[in-house]
């Protein structure tokens, strides 16, 4: 298979870039146990559902709305009447947020080296170029819950030296705010179309953990607008889904290949 091939040209056993991203997102929930997996974005939703179907069966997943599903369902499919195992109204969802029983994988319009994120405005606060979603749940999510990020298109415009507004709290700000902000604060991983990152340096700065197949470290650095820690040795290649994992992605969770619209090969 050519990495840039269409769905019909794919090898049965070789993963596309989008499928690698799904697998990398799934790994964010490894070891979480019985916790709500809240995901935003095609590949992150697929990742949460893949994790539940494979190595993390205790995860709680939803239909994208207020229903907890008895099992992971295909992307875009409603939970069948007999496939819902619970109702999760907004007040109960907020209880989970406030009590750390939710691992959310959010998106970010901007992210800096310490994991501060912006989903509110682009440009100066008093005269922004663009108005975005607003901070919404980002402050509470990052203070109260484990948080990861899924960014489909990494570039220096997204990976920035300083965010235009802080919506989600990073490690430097959590430390500065003290125990009330840092007690439950934890940024697990960042997954992009180029690689996987964590915040494993002594000062909680972003570190390159792996590059996706076919991507070089230099490409990742060129797509990053701040100094990125890469370690002293060779950067590993992100694990590809294989065998049953590929079958679940292609035949069970995303038979319409919606993942390929989010991440081009």
Q: Predicted regions: what is each one?
A:
Residues 23-26, 218-221, 246-250:
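Generic detector of well-ordered alpha-helical segments enriched in charged/polar residues
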């Amino acid at each position: 298979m050519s990495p840039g091939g269409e769905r019909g040209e794919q090898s049965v056993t070789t993963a596309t870039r989008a499928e690698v991203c799904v697998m990398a997102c799934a790994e964010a929930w490894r070891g979480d146990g019985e916790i709500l997996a809240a995901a935003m974005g095609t590949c992150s939703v697929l990742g949460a559902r893949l994790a539940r179907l494979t190595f993390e069966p205790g995860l709680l997943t939803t239909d994208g709305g207020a229903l907890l599903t008895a099992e992971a369902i295909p992307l875009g499919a409603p939970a069948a009447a007999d496939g819902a195992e619970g109702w999760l109204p907004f007040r109960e969802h907020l209880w989970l947020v406030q009590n750390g029983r939710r691992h959310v994988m959010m998106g970010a319009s901007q992210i800096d080296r310490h994991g501060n994120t912006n989903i509110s405005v682009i440009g100066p606060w008093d005269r922004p170029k663009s108005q975005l979603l607003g901070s919404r749940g980002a402050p509470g999510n990052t203070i109260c819950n484990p948080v990861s990020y899924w960014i489909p298109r990494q570039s220096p415009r997204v990976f920035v030296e300083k965010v235009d507004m802080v919506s989600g709290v990073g490690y430097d700000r959590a430390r500065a705010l003290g125990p009330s902000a840092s007690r439950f604060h934890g940024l697990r991983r960042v997954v992009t179309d180029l690689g996987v990152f964590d915040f494993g340096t002594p000062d909680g700065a972003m570190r390159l953990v792996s590059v996706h197949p076919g991507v070089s470290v230099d490409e990742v650095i060129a797509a990053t607008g701040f100094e990125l820690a890469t370690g002293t040795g060779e950067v590993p290649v992100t694990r590809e889904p294989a065998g049953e994992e590929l079958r679940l992605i292609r035949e069970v969770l995303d038979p319409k290949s919606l993942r390929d619209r989010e991440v081009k090969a």
